From Swiss-Prot:
Keywords: ATP-binding, GTP-binding, Ligase, Magnesium, Manganese, Metal-binding, Nucleotide-binding. The lineage of its organism: Archaea, Methanobacteriati, Methanobacteriota, Methanomada group, Methanococci. The gene is mptN. One of its GO terms (cellular component) is cytoplasm. It is an enzyme of class 6 (ligase). The keyword Magnesium applies. It comes from Methanocaldococcus jannaschii (strain ATCC 43067 / DSM 2661 / JAL-1 / JCM 10045 / NBRC 100440) (Methanococcus jannaschii). InterPro entries: ATP-grasp, ATP-grasp_RimK-type, ATP_grasp_subdomain_1, Rp_bS6_RimK/Lys_biosynth_LsyX, THMPT_Glu_ligase. It holds the Pfam family RimK. This is Tetrahydromethanopterin:alpha-L-glutamate ligase.
Length: 291
């Protein structure tokens, strides 16, 4: 099999996948998206130096970089000729928190109470209704830009927070803050590949309430319960993804979906997983391409 790996940098995830490619004797090519050339009414469709991308068996998308509509459109074009993992439409839905909430809602999957608005007045109304809320940028990952706001804050403080947030991100994605069911802040990352939840971990908050490993959180192994398996698979499928990192949070009335990641890292999860995640992912990709 010939696999393209599209990424702006050769990070730990890419290196891990390359090791698996070498183990399984998969012919791979690391592709820098800025050097792809699209052709029309010519003798090629998509070219990378002297290689033709539509002659690959599959392309794996790791990191396109930010704010590149052209690169994303290239994926859509490429997907007409070969499988792209993850599918561009799925990446589009998962990278946009508003669209993620839309598809979770359409598929009747539990998520925290959420409102999305550009109005500062409406934002204040809903922060007060939730009593404690989390503001998130619609686009973003790793916990960056996320702000926790409480009802009891002075109105001047709330306005300052909201004005600064709006200046940066324009749109407010506001979720009720889910109070921890135990004594510590934690959530669950379930790693789903095709029809299988291959591993899961607890991400436990560091010095603050954010559980992201990139924000100082630590990881512990999480047993894959029937509830985790069922919800993670449904969330992945709702967004039209081949594989995903599904973030779940425990609440008094069961698990809720926080986020679905379409280009998730598995490096932190590998520390507590008995499964070699890169191997499992590549095995599933090979099966998919052959089917």
């Amino acid at each position: 099999m010939k696999l393209g790996i599209i990424t702006i940098e050769r990070d730990a995830v890419v290196n891990d996948l390359i090791k698996s490619c070498e183990k399984y004797e998969v012919d791979y090519k690391v592709i820098t998206p800025s050097n792809i050339v699209a052709g029309f009414n010519l003798d090629f469709k998509l070219k990378y130096y002297k290689s033709f991308l539509d002659e690959l068996d599959c392309c794996f998308v790791r990191n396109l970089g930010w704010d590149s509509f052209f690169r994303f459109d290239v994926l859509k074009y490429l997907n007409h000729y070969i499988p792209v993992i993850n599918p561009p439409d799925g990446i589009d839905r998962a990278s946009n928190k508003f669209l993620t909430s839309v598809f979770l809602e359409l598929n009747n999957l539990p998520q925290p109470k959420t409102v999305v608005t550009e109005s500062i007045n409406e934002a204040i109304v809903w922060i007060d209704k939730f009593e404690e809320a989390v503001l998130k940028p619609i686009f973003g990952c790793g916990g960056e830009g996320i702000v926790r706001v409480k009802k009891e804050l002075p109105i001047s403080t709330k306005l300052k927070i909201l004005n600064e947030f709006k200046e940066k991100y324009n749109t407010f994605y506001i979720q009720e803050f889910i109070k921890p069911v135990r004594n510590e802040h934690r959530d669950i990352r379930a790693f789903v590949v095709d029809d299988e939840v291959v591993a899961a971990m607890y991400r436990i908050g560091g010095e603050n309430w954010k559980n992201n490993v990139s924000q100082g959180g630590r990881v512990e192994k999480c047993e894959i319960t029937e509830e985790i398996e069922k919800l993670a698979l449904k969330a992945k499928n709702a967004l039209g993804l081949f594989y995903a990192g599904v973030d779940l949070i425990e609440s008094e009335d069961g698990l809720k979906v926080l986020e679905v990641n379409s280009t998730p890292s598995w490096i932190g999860l590998s520390k507590v997983s008995e499964v070699n995640i890169a191997d499992k992912l590549l095995e599933k990709i090979i099966q998919y391409v052959k089917s």
